Amino acid sequence: MRTLFRTTEFDAFYDSQPDKVKVKLGYAMKVVADIKVLNAKLVKKLVDSDFYELRVSVGNEYRVILFTIDKPNIVESEQILLLN
């Protein structure tokens, strides 16, 4: 449903995480890619911004900044850029 594009900064962040966090981030990215309407616990729009925040909790809270490339709304978007 959605195509996720990863920046080199995101890849560096992802590679530096422990395996448990990588598993949860991978699952969260799959949900973002496959599910049209996303739960606000997982993805939240940042106030007064074009960015969204992907949240994963594994002991600590890990956050990834998302940007919709093709549409202003994440529900309508088919292309998402993973920043960090």
What are the functions of these language-model segments?
Residues 1-24:
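Arg/Lys-rich, positively charged N-terminal/basic patches that mediate binding to nucleic acids
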Residues 30-59:
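A short, surface-exposed loop/turn module that caps and links secondary-structure elements
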Residues 60-84:
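Enriched for short, Lys/Arg-rich terminal
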Residues 1-7, 40-44, 82:
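Generic preference for hydrophobic/aromatic residues in regular secondary structure cores
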